[in-house]
Amino acid sequence: MTIIDASERIAQLRQEIERHNYLYFNEAKPELSDYEFDKLLEELMALEREFPDLLTPDSPSQRVGGTITKEFPVVTHREPMLSLANTYSAGEVAEFYNRVAKLLAAENVHKQEMVAELKFDGVAISLLYRDGVLVRGATRGDGVQGDDITPNIRTIASIPLRLHQPLAGEVEVRGEIFMRKEDFEQLNDNRPEEERFANPRNATAGTLKLQDSAEVARRRMNFVAYYLKGLKDETLDHVSRLHKLEALGFTTGGHYRRCKTIEEINTFINEWEEKRWKLPYETDGVVLKLNNVQLWEQLGATAKSPRWAIAYKYPAQQARTQLCNVVFQVGRIGTITPVAELTPVLLAGSTVSRSTLHNFDEIERLSVMILDYVMIEKSGEVIPKVVRTLPDERPADAHAIAIPTHCPECDTPLIKPENEVSWYCPNEEHCPAQIRGRLLHFASRNAMDIKGLGDALVEQLVAWGLVHDVGDLYLLQEPQLERMERMGKKSAQNLIRALDESRTRSYDRLLYALGIRHVGRATARELAHAFPTLDALMQANEERLAEVPDIGTTVAQSIVDFFAKPSSRQLVDKLREARLQLAASASKIEQVNRNFEGMSLLFTGTLERYTRQQAAELVVERGGRVVESISKKTSLLVAGRDGGSKLDKAHKLGVRVISEDEFMGMM
């Protein structure tokens, strides 16, 4: 291929890829499967490698990341990125509306049209485009200066690297980066329990600060635009600018409305208070802006916020209930967590009977007692939390919560490490709760995926003394299992079969399954690449470990401490005897493709070459996930013999159906 041919093909591929990016992220109308899209991207990247002079910063290939930024440069915003003043009641909204009316009357302006739009619960950023090409992305920072995070911004597919319409000179686009609920849950599922993010906004903020843009690219984030500055025609009103942003390739969320009266504003606010829970992302309020942009400058701003806009914040979903008891749970790494047992109450569409109290300090801060009436809140967090007590309603028989000094499971004196807020049980080898926690983690779907090994059975195995660590699982025999409650011959056979199948799980999944503190799925993969055998990893010191991407001194120390324990070395010996994968297989780690990255697959009918478990393993190893029911979000339905009703449903929903042969070809 000549450089001229390559240039033409590269231009075609870039245009096609950006079109499909826009359809997927902005219109939610994908025309290609993830596999087909990835093939286009692979072709583009191959051509750019072959003809490096044709690589440009606005190429879609630059979204995959790979840049390591040791320190983000500080940049000054062209105009301050002010935060909006918040309101929390209809009365405050009316005060704002009347205040603007008064200011406009002073300017001899009598048309007061407002725009109401949903407030995304994300992280504000500024994008600078020069002659239509993205040249900088920066955080809000203190409003005057922010961090230049351009390498991370380039990885977000809903941000165009080149505007869809030609614009000369410089224009600035501002908006919010956020994470969809589904992507947030998937990210948390792959993190150690103690390092999970509380909500999508925290996950977004933490991701944008990462120094490795390749890791940012792996975490699916989105962008919604709400501000455009630098157009030649500055007379456009706010709604017209939102339309212009959409024409330039951005999504604006689509949920905004012109409002000419305070009644119309209140209608929009009330309408979305309930509807927002059905959205695939978090929204915590409504932003109100004067539609006439020319008046923004005339109305001006205070030191902190503009006078022409305000944010109405929905109250967090709260409910009143009674705290009946507090139990202290012991996690798999020994963390003691107080959990409130509550009178069941309906909150945000579900019945809540338990709520976290986080730690002992939180109990003291809340001054909460047994039998107190409390307010619980659900505001994007993983589980509800107690936010305050109602002391005026305290019953006469309310009594203090007995804070334990010893482990509620094994009676070992608790310890509180320096610089930590939680108390721990140090008896990790013999504490039944910690053993149960490690077994359940080992058997979980993202780890060894041992079907049938649930809470009830694990509790019996530990109570009967049959299992002391995960290595003992592979010594279990059918007759032992048949004697357990609700474990007949068939269930025992199924569990033994599931344990046998787990012996083939990849080395990186085994590393995650070991439950080393601070080692999630992503870190386990990096370790498997850096140390191809478990023996090599066990011999590594902190300095060598810290050289691995995304592993700092804390994680390195945790790994060294884990393998320094005699019990850990004994466990490795058991796993070796059980014939588990203690080394990286070239097919599973080194050379495995990622053809199913981000895809959800469903199997139906009988497969000729694989069991369902084997097929699912192949999908997960290649970046995909296997679902149990079909929906519009399903990427592919793999149809074996006698596919049944799922085939009909797939055709109705427009889900792509492939044969087992096509499935093999994709691998």
UniProtKB/Swiss-Prot annotation:
Q: List the disulfide bonds.
A: none
The EC number(s) this enzyme carries = 6.5.1.2
GO MF terms listed in the record are: DNA binding; DNA ligase (NAD+) activity; metal ion binding
Active-site residues?
A: K119 (n6-amp-lysine intermediate)
Any one Pfam family match given in the protein's UniProt record, by short name:
DNA_ligase_OB
Which transformation does this protein catalyse, written as a reaction? NAD(+) + (deoxyribonucleotide)n-3'-hydroxyl + 5'-phospho-(deoxyribonucleotide)m = (deoxyribonucleotide)n+m + AMP + beta-nicotinamide D-nucleotide
PROSITE patterns from the xrefs? BRCT, DNA_LIGASE_N1
For this record, an example GO cellular component is: cytosol
Cofactor(s), names only, from the UniProt record: Mg(2+); Mn(2+)
Keyword terms, alphabetized: DNA damage, DNA repair, DNA replication, Ligase, Magnesium, Manganese, Metal-binding, NAD, Zinc
Residue stretches in coiled coil: none
SUPFAM superfamilies to which the protein is assigned, alphabetical? BRCT domain, DNA ligase/mRNA capping enzyme, catalytic domain, Nucleic acid-binding proteins, RuvA domain 2-like
State the function annotated in the UniProt record.
DNA ligase that catalyzes the formation of phosphodiester linkages between 5'-phosphoryl and 3'-hydroxyl groups in double-stranded DNA using NAD as a coenzyme and as the energy source for the reaction. It is essential for DNA replication and repair of damaged DNA.
Cross-referenced PANTHER family:
CHROMOSOME TRANSMISSION FIDELITY FACTOR 18, DNA LIGASE
HAMAP family assigned to the protein according to its UniProt record, in alphabetical order: DNA_ligase_A (MF_01588)
Q: What is this protein called?
A: DNA ligase
Q: Which source organism does the UniProt entry give?
A: Chlorobium chlorochromatii (strain CaD3)
Q: What is the lineage of its organism?
A: Bacteria, Pseudomonadati, Chlorobiota, Chlorobiia, Chlorobiales
In the UniProt record, the gene name given for this protein reads ligA
